[in-house]
Swiss-Prot record:
GO terms for biological process: negative regulation of transcription by RNA polymerase II; response to nitrate. This is Monothiol glutaredoxin-S6. Residues 1-101 form the Glutaredoxin domain. It holds the Pfam family Glutaredoxin. The keyword Iron applies. The lineage of its organism: Eukaryota, Viridiplantae, Streptophyta, Embryophyta, Tracheophyta. Keywords: 2Fe-2S, Cytoplasm, Iron, Iron-sulfur, Metal-binding, Redox-active center. One of its GO terms (molecular function) is 2 iron, 2 sulfur cluster binding. One of its GO terms (cellular component) is cytoplasm. Belongs to the glutaredoxin family. CC-type subfamily. CDD domains: GRX_GRXh_1_2_like.
Length: 102
């Protein structure tokens, strides 16, 4: 889990993804639609991607991708992010994290 913490440190939005995952792509599209500054880690392109994926599962992210962190806080996967959007809470959370300025 330390490897995950070091990757999300000092970044407003981090998405752990796999390049072949359509839900990961959808969440990236949603968040980038706000003009948010985000960092995306494609786990299938990392040499230690499986290790990071195991750490994400230990943190409670099932399925392991997408795993979204906003303001260094673990938000969850696609369902949790979409729920925030439906409740009109996602934009405010992105603002508080410094990912968007509006």
């Amino acid at each position: 889990m330390e490897s995950v913490r070091s990757l999300v440190e000092d970044k407003p939005v981090v998405i752990f993804s796999k390049s072949s995952c359509c839900m990961s792509h959808s969440i990236q599209t949603l968040i980038s639609g706000f003009g948010a500054k985000m960092t995306v880690y494609e786990l299938d392109q990392f040499s230690n991607g499986q290790e990071i994926e195991k750490a994400l599962v230990q943190m409670g992210c099932k399925p392991s991708v997408p795993a979204v962190f906003i303001g260094q806080q673990f938000i969850g996967g696609a369902n949790q992010v979409m729920t925030l959007q439906v409740k009109n809470q996602l934009a405010a959370m992105l603002r508080r994290a410094g990912a968007i300025w509006v």
